[in-house]
Amino acid sequence: MPRVWDVPVHDSTRVRDVRVAAEQAAALAGLDEGRTATAALVATELATNLLKHAGGGRVLIDVVAPPVLAGGRDGARLVQVTAVDHGPGIADVPAALGDGFTTARSLGAGLGTCARLSDHFDLHSAPGRGTVVAARIGAVPDGPAAEPGPADRVRAGGVNLPFGGAQYSGDAWAWVRAGDLVTLMLADGLGHGPEAARASTTAVEALRDAAHVTPADALRRLDRALTGTRGAAVAVAQVDTRAGVLRFAGVGNIGARLCEGGTWRHLVSRPGIIGTHRPTTLREETADWADDRVLVLHSDGLPSRWTPTSETCSTTADPAVTAAVTLRDASSPARPVRDDTAVAVLAPVPADRP
C-alpha cells in the first residue's frame, strides 16, 4: 500500500518532518540522489513559506503518475508536494514567482525557485482565502518525448488526505491510458485504516489491466479483483479523445461532477460496494468531451455541502491544484474533514501549452 504524508505545519519543527517525508516519497518513486534533493528542497521551501507568510497550513506529499500519460507509458512516478493554507493569499502572483521575491505580508518566498526546479508547478491564490501550491518532481527523462496525439491533450491530477494523519489512506485515485482512451478512477475503501487502504490499492492495481475496456466492464473486473477485501465505492470515467466522448459508471458513494462550458452536471453512481455487493446492472452515462470540460471525482470525505465554483471549472489550472482548492474550500481549520478524502480531476491541456 502506498504511503500518503499529511504534515500540518504550525511550528518550525514540522519543516524537518516535511523534508523527511519528501525524501521518503522520493525513495518510493525511485528518484536518484539529485532529484531526491530537489524534492526535499521544494518541500522545505513550501513548508517554510506556510510558517512565515501564511500563519501555517499543511503539506500533502504523495507519489503520483504524470499529469499527461505520454504514449501510454504510465509507469513513471513523481513526488507531488502540495501546500495548502487559509492565509492572506498573494497580492501579485507573477511577482511572487520571480526568484528571490519575498514579503512578510503574503506568501511568496522561494516560489520562483520551486517552479524552476519542479517538473510541473502551479498555484492558485485568492486574497483573504489562501494559497494552494502543487509541485511535482520526477526522474530525469531518459529519452525523447513521444509524438503527441489526441490523448496527450487530456491531463489528470488529484490529492489524497488520510483521516487523522494516518500513514495510509483508504481512498485512492489513478488513471491509465490505452491508445486514445484515458481512464480516471477513484476508489474509497470501506471505512478507513489499513484494510480500507488495501481495498483501494487493489482497485488501482486492477485498473492497470482494464485501460482498454469500458467503465462498466472495468467495474466488473475490479469487483472480481476486490473479492476478499472490505470492498470499495468506485467510480470510473473514460474519455475517448479521438471521438470526443466521456463515459462514466460508478458504484457506491463517489461524487462526480462534470463542468460543461460553465454549467455543472451530476454523474450518478448506483448503490452498492465493489467487491462485496455489486449491482447486477451497471449503467453508463455518456457526455460530449471538449476543451471546456472539467470532471471532478471525490470520495464522501468531502462534506456534502460542497458545491463547485467557477474556479473549480478552470481549464487552465493544474488538475492537482483544482483538487486541492476543492478540498480546502470544502473544509476549514475549524471544520476538518472527518474521513479519508480524495479528489481527482480530469481536464484538457490548455491549447497554448505543448
Where do the model's predicted regions map?
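Conserved subregion of the PPM/PP2C metallophosphatase catalytic domain
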Residues: 1-13, 20, 29, 74, ...
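Conserved beta-strand-loop-beta-strand hairpin that lines the nucleotide-binding pocket
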Residues: 1-5, 47-147, 178-184, 239-241, ...
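Conserved short strand/loop->alpha-helix "switch" segment adjacent to the catalytic nucleotide/phosphoryl-transfer site
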Residues: 16, 20-44, 103
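Histidine-centered phosphotransfer motif of kinases
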Residues: 39-54, 195
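Short amphipathic alpha-helical face segments that pack within enzyme cores
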Residues: 113, 198-202
